[in-house]
Amino acid sequence: GNEPAHDSSREDHRERVLGWLRELAESGETGKGFPSEYGGEDAVDRSVVSFETLAFGDLSLLVKVGVQFGLFGGAILHLGSERHHEEYLPRLIRAELLGCFAMTETGHGSNVQEVGTTATYDPETQEFVIHTPGEQCRKDYIGNAARDGHMAAVFCQLITGDSDETRGVHCVLVPIRDEQGNPMPGVEISDCGAKLGLDGVDNGRLTFDQVRVPRENLLDRYAQVAEDGTYTSSIENPTKRFFTMLGTLVQGRVSVCGAAINATKVAQVVAVRHGLERRQFGPPGADEEATLMTYRTHQRRLLPDLAKTYALHFAQEGLVRDLHAVFNDDDGDDRRRRELETLAAGLKAIATWHATHTIQQCREACGGAGYLRGNRFAALKADTDVFTTFEGDNTVLLQLVAKGMLTGYRGEFEELNTLGIAAFVAANVVERFVE
């Protein structure tokens, strides 16, 4: 573009956001979702609610916090084993170790199963060799990468044994900067440059050229590689293993959903207050003009969306309760987890699309005043726009919801005899007819 990749205002914004993140880490607010033995509070629900609250302020801080504690920290917590927790979580929670979540590539976003970055095991040195085989396989749009991150949780195709056959996508911890902040040997880091919004987040690209990391850096909760390269996993089916691993990261989707709802509330507060104060037209002979909110056209412009925000708010509260229950369930009920993933996917899509639509409606309802930066619509529009894309493209997420519902129906039908199926269909037909 015409804008330089590094301008002073963006650098200042990034520096401020990093300072705020460190302050939050010192306060203990950002560690609530982690185990108490590592400095957390074992409170997934309070963690999500704290995160959502940041949407009332600078959304760059919200996203930066999400990358550091939700994505990078969440990958280590949910995909790593106890030794990873002991080594990394305390420093991560205190923001002494800043990290990235390197999943998306230039050529693959939604289709994570086909990412191109490779991690090839070398039994002679007991190391994984991390490599970017082409430009489409570089890690792209990665938060914390361009400036501040020192380690990346890299999702890559794991290759073990004599063949080039992949074991599927796994996550490996890769140091990307040394203590002085310089890129590690074989790691190329670049800045994504100017974005539509979220200027306080340092999104960057990562390319790996035969970068070696110890065998222990594989996050091995679900799959292990022995010293001789033998691969083992408690989940034999590679597709099921992949979706189980991704399913543990559902908290990010739930968090973005809540953040979108809260950002929408900010826009609606401004617009409704403006509508109650601003006067325009009125009956002939009246002493003063009527407020905008007196007019049904203005009410219809704002109030149905406001009602929907209330509905989404309460739906989100229920989703957070479900998330907390599922992640504190020692039995690990697969069905409950699948239902949670379906709910989170659907609500995230609905809430973020609602945010994009409603913030624009609120801006228009404030007239020229809505176009002034001081009234926050510029930042709200620019910073929330990508919410419909990250943590899952909304259209793809709705397809995930459809798949989840069909799977659920199939499960119910399998448990029914012919009479039961007839009763089930009849009940649903009656229900739809009544609606």
Regions found by a protein language model. Name each.
Residues 1-99, 109-110, 121, 125-129, ...:
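Amphipathic, small/basic residue-rich leader segments at the start of a protein or domain
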Residues 2-6, 31-36, 53-57, 69-74, ...:
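Glycine- and acidic
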Residues 123, 127-188:
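A short core secondary-structure module
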Residues 142-144, 207-252, 272-293:
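A glycine-rich, basic-preceded beta-loop-alpha segment at the flavin cofactor/substrate interface
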Residues 184-210:
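Flexible, small-/acidic-enriched active-site or ligand-binding loops
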Residues 213, 301-355, 360-363, 367:
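Accessory "access/gating" subregions that flank catalytic or transport cores
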Residues 247-327, 427, 431-435:
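Extended amphipathic alpha-helical segments enriched in small hydrophobics
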Residues 341-434:
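Alpha-helix capping/hinge segments and adjacent helical runs
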